């Protein structure tokens, strides 16, 4: 039995059980793809496969039941189990923001090379080529890692409200890392690239790959930045990381709707940044890794403005969070795959382009930091710490010597308020894989212009 055969049976199946619950949703998926992982001279993963499965979500009197399965014949049993669970725990009112049911097929087509037309041997040869570039950069490179993945996903969604959706899309990603060692010093360089357009976006990346290894080797001999508070200029890639990790997660309404104190902090109308600051999230802009037609609750993709002219004006919702807060759903309920229920997730998150010429961002900075790209980061509520991939000192308004081990830390609200200039450049970074609630690696897009921020705490050697 295939998805097309099952699709026509879903409305009737839901109809048989509709009287037993307030809301029923069935989501079925089939995916096929390739996974390759090389570590130094070892092949860790080399596989092609097809996966299929489904999930049932049921809400009754505010209680949710969830069940997943990987054999189609288990669907009815899992539906009954989810209904029983929801009826067991439900003791309140079911509040789901209303939406119009849709019957539609949405296909996000490839615009470049189809990965299915590329043999597994050729995909591995591409990984071998990039791995050789990393390893051949310097004899100081001790470990390399190349990872390739492509997948085509087809999803069916049927609900007790009459929605019957079919969506199909591709996602491709490559990750590169090189570790350099010299005596007791160890440095790492990383790059990631992703696409929903085609296999060609993963080809001809020699300069990008070599750059990761070269940064690791170069950093071995660089001085460590002196840790203190600086004015900092960050490039668009770091801006994208900052807006996603530090601010975007705080805009997800499932962080707010049962936390009155934090809901007060994130109250609409509160000023967080300068009048030039505009922040958005949305799956509606086409061609990005966080783009789609409908979310996993059947809500149409949209663009939500989160900050307008420096003030908080919106947040990201599922139907439940929107219903409980009396707001409109935004199309941000997503799940990684059928094993997990949809939760509020970002899609494509960006800061709007400003008006300050990039060349003017360093003007007037006597001593500061210019940071670009990223190595990693973490957030804890409103606090964040990010590691820059590369950094230079700014002296007397000019770029000066490169430095290493630059970490940027702070409170997101104070940092937004300390934005001094928003540049007129812009870049979309398609390397993102977001993690939340155990659902790690969800494809997202991040974007933004270069920013100038005052009073950023920069870690390094003690002053």
From Swiss-Prot:
GO molecular function, one term: metallopeptidase activity
Family: Belongs to the peptidase U62 family.
Keywords: Hydrolase, Metalloprotease, Protease
Alphabetical list of Pfam families matching this protein: PmbA_TldD_1st, PmbA_TldD_2nd, PmbA_TldD_3rd
GO cellular component: cytosol
Protein known as: Metalloprotease slr0863
Function text: Probable metalloprotease.
């Amino acid at each position: 039995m295939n998805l097309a055969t099952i699709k026509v049976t879903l409305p009737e199946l839901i109809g048989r059980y509709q009287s037993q619950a307030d809301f029923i949703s069935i989501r079925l998926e089939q995916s096929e793809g390739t996974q390759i992982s090389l570590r130094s001279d070892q092949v860790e993963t080399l596989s092609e496969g097809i996966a299929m499965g489904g999930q049932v979500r049921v809400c009754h009197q505010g209680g949710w039941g969830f069940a997943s399965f990987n054999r189609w014949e288990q669907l009815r049993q899992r539906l009954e189990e989810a209904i029983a669970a929801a009826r067991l725990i439900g003791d309140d009112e079911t509040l789901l923001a209303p939406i119009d049911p849709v019957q539609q097929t949405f296909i996000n087509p490839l615009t470049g090379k189809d990965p299915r037309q590329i043999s597994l041997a050729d995909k591995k040869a591409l990984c071998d080529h990039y791995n050789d570039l990393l390893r051949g950069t310097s004899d100081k490179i001790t470990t390399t890692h190349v990872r390739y993945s492509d997948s085509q996903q087809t999803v069916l969604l049927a609900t007790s409200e009459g929605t019957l959706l079919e969506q199909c899309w591709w996602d491709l990603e490559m990750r590169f890392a090189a570790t350099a060692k010299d005596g007791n010093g160890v440095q790492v360089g990383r790059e990631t690239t992703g696409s929903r357009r085609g296999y060609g976006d993963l080809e001809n990346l020699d300069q990008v790959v070599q750059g990761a290894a070269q940064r690791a080797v170069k950093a071995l001999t660089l001085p460590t930045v002196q840790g203190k508070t600086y004015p900092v200029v960050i490039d668009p890639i770091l801006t994208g990381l900052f807006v996603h990790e530090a601010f975007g997660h705080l805009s997800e309404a499932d962080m707010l709707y049962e936390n009155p104190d934090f809901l007060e902090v994130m109250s609409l109308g509160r000023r967080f940044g300068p009048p030039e600051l505009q922040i958005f999230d949305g799956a509606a802009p086409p061609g990005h890794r966080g783009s789609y037609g409908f979310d996993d609750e059947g809500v149409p993709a949209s663009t939500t403005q989160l900050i307008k002219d420096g003030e908080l004006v919106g947040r990201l919702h599922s139907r439940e969070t929107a219903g409980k807060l009396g707001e409109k759903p935004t199309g941000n309920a997503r799940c990684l795959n059928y094993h997990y229920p949809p939760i509020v997730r970002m899609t494509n998150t960006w800061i709007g382009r400003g008006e300050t010429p990039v060349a003017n961002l360093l003007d007037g900075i006597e001593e500061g930091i210019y940071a670009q790209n990223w190595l990693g980061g973490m957030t804890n509520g409103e606090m964040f710490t990010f590691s820059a991939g590369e950094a230079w000192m700014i002296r007397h308004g000019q770029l000066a010597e490169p430095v290493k081990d630059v970490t940027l830390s702070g409170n997101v609200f104070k940092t937004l308020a300390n934005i001094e200039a928003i540049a007129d450049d812009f870049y979309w970074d398609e390397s993102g894989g977001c993690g939340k609630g155990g659902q790690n690696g969800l494809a997202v897009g991040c974007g933004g212009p270069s920013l100038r921020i005052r009073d950023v705490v920069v870690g390094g050697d003690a002053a």
